[in-house]
């Protein structure tokens, strides 16, 4: 049965509104138009963190008010994948993960090629669902030929897929597929309806179309109060990266998400669903640590096996899983400080050697271990094999990459991009350690010298960890790694300090107000899908103050993100 529905089944496209002039091509030559003057765009229409990632660009002092945000952001690929998993039980089409079938996350108006990809993916998913009994039952639980089965399916599945109840007009539009020509079998009609849902704007986007003005708080007067369903959607995508569950939908339909206390109560419940929130927490921290393959650092997943014979495809996979497990564990049991100081590791037979452990004592499954801080110092995520092997060169460590990450993302050091007109430097000599080589290379001329002085020392302290994260006392260049190799003078906000070990370095970073401020700002950026601005800075400042308390948990931070006025209000703007 040929599907030609496009926007015909979805009233998100409000007549007369053109989303600031941008349109999304619909199937069959139709057009899906943005609603209410919003922008039919990705999550970063205001120029924020690309791909729904994190951004820590300084924004200035706090200014009371609700920030202007995009009105109809597009689902990120990871969100799309999570939604079809939760609604339909689909994690892959064939053997390809759903997110990998889509175009890369983007900003701006939907393009015709991107729209064609969404149509193709929706068609493939719908076909697979109808051919898979368990997935089919999640979509349609009655016989398509039974009286009112299709209408009931449209209403019940549509409530979940659109994150709101469908209008009578929308239900009727979906029902027209039952009388389309040429006629299809009952299962083909059901498949066409599911396909139509998967390409509808209210599924692919997260529209916020409420118009009720908020008048309860003078600083937010004139802002628009989100509907209870819109608040539920914000909650679910913030904490789960997916659609609301039945309990959250019921709270929304019962009008029980209008106050901060009501929102926080639901947030606390949802945070405890670890299989959902834990995954989202790991995703944030991977983005924050620039481990999501979108950052510009040089590592592309390969190392010289002649130098590092223990590094394999299996160890690389284990390293990624370990980092995810580490981030989740610290979030559920610790604080920001623990991210930088915890000696907990997750080990299996593929990554055990990186921690000096016997691989034969482990299986494929990751096992939580607490490493001996005296004999196996591994403070925090930046000493995990996954991080260290990513922030490394093909055949050596990279103090430059490791140091620049710490400088930019934890210490708020302004590291400008290299001048593209400046020639890449080379240096020759009998260098016994990588530190000697890097110092000769980057201290040779200006502007290299002044720039690298800001972050190279941070990386030098980490030279006992080799290019794949193992502890080393001998450099691959032949020299011994001594205390002199790993000692550096580093200038913090309070002044210069001599740092002699990774543990001392992480303790110092964990105590820095800048590190807490940047971490809070990264969360705000990630949660909103855009760069933080001066209105968001008020929330950032509040979270930074709370992070100064070592007893303040990361889960507490998640709950507090839902308490900002900007979580339940929005302001119209031109984005």
Regions found by a protein language model. Give the residues of each.
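A conserved hydrophobic secondary-structure block that centers on an alpha-helix together
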Residues: 145-193, 201
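Short, solvent-exposed loop/turn and secondary-structure capping segments
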Residues: 95-98, 167-170, 204-211, 215-218, ...
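Short, functional "switch" segments adjacent to catalytic/cofactor/reactive centers
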Residues: 107-155, 465-520
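Mature N-terminal segment immediately following signal peptide/propeptide cleavage
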Residues: 59-60, 66-95
């Amino acid at each position: 049965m040929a599907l030609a529905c496009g926007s015909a089944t979805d009233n998100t496209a409000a007549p007369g509104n053109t989303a600031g002039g941008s349109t999304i091509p619909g199937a069959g030559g139709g057009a899906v138009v943005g609603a209410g003057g919003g922008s039919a765009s990705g999550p970063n229409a205001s120029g924020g963190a690309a791909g729904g990632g994190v951004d820590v660009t300084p924004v200035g002092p706090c200014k009371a008010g609700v920030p202007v945000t995009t009105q109809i952001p597009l689902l990120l690929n990871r969100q799309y994948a999570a939604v079809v998993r939760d609604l339909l039980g689909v994690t892959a089409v064939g053997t390809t993960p759903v997110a990998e079938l889509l175009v890369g996350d983007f900003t701006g108006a939907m393009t015709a090629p991107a729209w064609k990809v969404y149509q193709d993916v929706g068609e493939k998913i719908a076909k697979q669902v109808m051919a898979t009994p368990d997935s089919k039952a999640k979509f349609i639980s009655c016989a398509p030929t039974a009286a009112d089965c299709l209408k009931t399916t449209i209403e019940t599945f549509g409530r979940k897929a659109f994150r709101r109840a469908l209008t009578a007009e929308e239900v009727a539009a979906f029902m027209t597929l039952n009388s389309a020509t040429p006629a299809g079998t009952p299962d083909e009609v059901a498949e066409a309806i599911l396909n139509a849902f998967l390409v509808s704007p209210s599924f692919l986007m997260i529209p916020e179309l409420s118009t009720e003005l908020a008048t309860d708080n003078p600083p937010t007067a004139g802002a628009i109060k989100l509907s209870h369903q819109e608040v539920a959607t914000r909650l679910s995508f913030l904490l789960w990266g997916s659609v609301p569950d039945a309990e959250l939908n019921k709270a929304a339909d019962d009008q029980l998400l209008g106050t901060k206390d009501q929102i926080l109560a639901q947030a606390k419940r949802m945070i405890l669903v670890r299989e959902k929130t834990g995954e989202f927490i790991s995703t944030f921290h991977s983005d924050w640590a620039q481990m999501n393959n979108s950052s510009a650092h040089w590592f592309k997943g390969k190392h010289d096996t002649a130098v590092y014979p223990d590094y394999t495809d299996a160890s690389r996979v284990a390293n990624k899983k370990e980092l995810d497990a580490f981030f989740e564990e610290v979030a559920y049991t610790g604080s920001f400080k623990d991210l930088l100081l915890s000696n907990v590791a997750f080990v299996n037979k593929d990554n055990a050697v990186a921690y000096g452990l016997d691989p034969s004592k482990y299986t494929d499954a990751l096992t939580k271990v607490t490493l001996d801080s005296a004999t196996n110092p591994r403070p925090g995520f930046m000493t995990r094999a996954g991080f260290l092997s990513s922030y490394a060169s093909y055949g050596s460590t990279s103090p430059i990459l490791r140091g620049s990450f710490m400088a930019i993302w934890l210490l708020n050091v302004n590291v400008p991009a290299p001048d593209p007109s400046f020639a890449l430097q080379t240096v020759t000599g009998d260098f016994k350690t990588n530190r000697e080589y890097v110092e000769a290379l980057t201290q040779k001329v200006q502007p290299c010298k002044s720039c690298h002085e800001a972050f190279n020392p941070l990386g030098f302290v980490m030279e006992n960890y080799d290019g794949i994260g193992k502890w080393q006392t001998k450099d691959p260049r032949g020299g011994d790694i001594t205390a002199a190799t790993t000692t550096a003078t580093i200038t913090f906000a309070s002044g210069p300090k001599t740092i002699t070990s990774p543990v001392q370095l992480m303790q110092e970073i964990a105590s820095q107000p800048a590190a807490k401020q940047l971490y809070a700002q990264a969360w705000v950026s990630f949660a909103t899908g855009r760069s933080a601005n001066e209105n968001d800075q008020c929330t950032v400042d509040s979270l930074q103050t709370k992070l100064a308390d070592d007893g303040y948990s990361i889960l507490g931070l998640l709950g507090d993100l839902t308490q900002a006025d900007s979580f339940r209000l929005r302001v119209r703007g031109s984005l």
